[in-house]
């Protein structure tokens, strides 16, 4: 693995499991010093141990990034591990799928706090921490649900579509400072968090409708994020990289 991120300081929110944990591993494998964020100390410690055992560099950031203060503190804590702060991956989310009739204030508020507001507060904090001469990279984890939706996903789809809007607006505003802002849009990826919404029949339909003939993995998504965070994507900003094996824009 090329060490193209050597010495750069990164923060991945929601990195105790799933896409976030795989992303932390991918960035560390490319040489980054990675802040692993989650709410649960045991998840963070396990992820950090996983990275260090593989020869990477990582540190724990146990903060509630659903608040402006929490994500700000997480970024500041990460910045203390190097001479600058370079990469933010806004990955944290809390998801519930409900029909239009079932949506409640508390569910929607929590999803908005973690999946929408935290993205804005994270960008704000990262932009302040990044070196104005060197810039940096921000990658927001959206979803193919922002592009093509399904029943019982009104709140989720709306939030992820909003993340794409935030991404483009932030890219326009921060590009002059050398800060690139992009998003990834994964399709349904098997993780610990998505287990409750999966079943064999639905997975089989998705596989049959996917040109690549399989479900995506957390490593597939992490590779896309690592690319967008790297200098290989130095002239790429305001983009949404769809990581879905082709299912969103094809019909089989």
Spans of model-derived segments:
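Short C-terminal tail/terminal secondary-structure segment
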Residues: 148, 226, 237-252
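Short, small/polar-rich loop/turn modules that mediate ligand/substrate recognition or access, typified
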Residues: 135, 175, 180, 236-238
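Active-site loop immediately N-terminal to the catalytic Tyr-X3-Lys motif
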Residues: 101, 148-154, 176-177, 213, ...
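Residue(s) in the substrate-gating loop at a strand-loop-helix junction
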Residues: 143
């Amino acid at each position: 693995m090329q060490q193209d991120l050597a010495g750069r300081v990164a923060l991945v929110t929601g990195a105790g499991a799933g896409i976030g944990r795989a992303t932390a591993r991918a960035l560390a494998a490319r040489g980054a010093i990675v802040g692993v964020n989650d709410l649960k100390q045991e998840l963070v410690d396990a992820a950090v141990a996983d990275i260090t055992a593989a020869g990477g560099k990582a540190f724990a950031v146990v903060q509630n990034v659903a608040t402006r203060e929490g994500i700000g503190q997480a970024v500041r804590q990460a910045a203390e591990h190097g001479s600058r702060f370079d990469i933010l991956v806004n990955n944290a989310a809390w998801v519930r799928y409900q029909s239009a009739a079932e949506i409640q204030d508390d569910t929607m508020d929590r999803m908005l706090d973690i999946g929408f507001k935290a993205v804005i507060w994270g960008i704000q904090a990262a932009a302040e921490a990044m070196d104005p001469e060197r810039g940096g990279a921000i990658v927001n984890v959206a979803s193919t649900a922002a592009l093509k939706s399904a029943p019982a996903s009104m709140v989720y789809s709306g939030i992820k579509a909003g993340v794409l809007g935030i991404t483009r607006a932030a890219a326009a505003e921060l590009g002059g400072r050398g800060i690139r802002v992009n998003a990834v849009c994964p399709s349904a990826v098997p993780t610990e968090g998505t287990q409750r919404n999966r079943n064999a029949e639905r997975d089989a339909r998705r596989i049959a409708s996917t040109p690549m003939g399989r479900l995506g993995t957390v490593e597939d998504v992490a590779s896309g994020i690592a690319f967008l965070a790297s200098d290989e994507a130095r002239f790429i900003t305001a983009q949404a990289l769809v990581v879905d094996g082709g299912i969103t824009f094809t019909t089989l």
